[in-house]
């Protein structure tokens, strides 16, 4: 598979695949890096697409940088999308965990044709509030201190919480498929169901899955899911029509299905944290 290392302004990136009119933007999660896009490239590049994977601040070739926060990452992703729009005719998104949340914020007004979200963080405010509860930190204390280092390795930030509240996800128009793990500890099932229902997303659930898809049976499900939802024939219109046809009646799980094991491969999912 062809591989070209790029520098987009200060953003380290790698482009996989032969020249094509279609490209997938690959956005990793916490503890990830752009090289994770190679595994996804092995699936979509033979189908005639390319993959542009980037390093977010504090990750990969940018480990020495600071700024793994929405007020820095969101403008970066918008700049990358503008770059892609100037060079490719069809642009899709493949993202993980908090990388999916950043992407949902950044690309709401410049949506990709298609989006595949793996273990996406869909309600960041609730996640932060849950972690505040675990750390026994209330809002008054967090506002007074600005930041609070929790015993479980995360730093709670008042500025971050305020930014999250000021920028909720209210708009998403891409044809989207979500792969959700039944044992995900960052996003609960009700949140995933509500998001899928609100934005018309397809939702696939691996009941034995974890936020980080890393065990052989989990990697097999990820592999099969990516194979199913990629390819030149998967246009935005076709995806939407397929989901509408299989959507259950109100009160049921929105566009959801369950998957068991298939053939395993190396995964591009990240550590189970944000």
Residue ranges and their predicted role:
Residues 1-17:
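N-terminal cap/lid segment of alpha/beta-hydrolase-fold proteins
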Residues 30-42, 190:
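The serine-hydrolase catalytic nucleophile loop
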Residues 44-63:
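Conserved alpha/beta-hydrolase
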Residues 95-103:
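Gly/Ala-rich beta-loop-alpha elbow adjacent to hydrolase catalytic centers
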Residues 110-194, 198-205, 209-234:
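The alpha/beta-hydrolase serine catalytic core
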């Amino acid at each position: 598979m062809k591989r070209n290392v790029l520098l987009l302004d200060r953003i380290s990136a790698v482009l996989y695949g032969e020249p094509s009119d279609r490209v997938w933007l690959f956005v990793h999660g916490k503890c990830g890096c752009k090289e994770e896009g190679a595994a996804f490239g092995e699936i979509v590049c033979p189908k005639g697409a390319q993959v542009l994977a980037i390093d977010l601040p504090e990750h990969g070739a940018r480990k020495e940088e600071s700024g793994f926060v929405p007020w820095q990452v969101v403008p970066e992703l918008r700049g990358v999308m503008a770059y892609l729009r100037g060079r490719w005719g069809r642009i899709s998104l493949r993202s993980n965990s908090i990388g999916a949340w950043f992407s949902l914020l950044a690309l709401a007004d410049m949506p990709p044709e298609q989006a595949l979200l793996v273990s996406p963080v869909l309600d960041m405010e609730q996640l932060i509030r849950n972690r505040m509860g675990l750390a026994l930190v209330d809002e008054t204390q967090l506002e007074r201190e600005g930041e609070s280092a929790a015993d479980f390795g995360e730093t709670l930030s008042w500025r971050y919480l305020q930014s999250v509240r000021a920028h909720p996800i209210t708009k998403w128009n891409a044809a989207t498929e979500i792969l959700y793990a039944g044992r995900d500890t960052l996003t609960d099932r009700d949140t995933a169901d509500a998001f899928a229902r609100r934005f018309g997303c397809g939702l696939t659930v691996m009941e034995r899955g974890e936020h980080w898809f890393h065990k052989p049976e989990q990697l097999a499900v990820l592999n099969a899911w990516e194979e199913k939802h990629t390819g030149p024939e998967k246009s935005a219109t076709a995806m939407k029509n397929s989901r509408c046809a299989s959507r259950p009646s109100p009160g049921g799980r929105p566009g959801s299905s369950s998957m068991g094991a298939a053939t395993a491969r190396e995964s591009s999912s990240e550590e189970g944290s944000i």
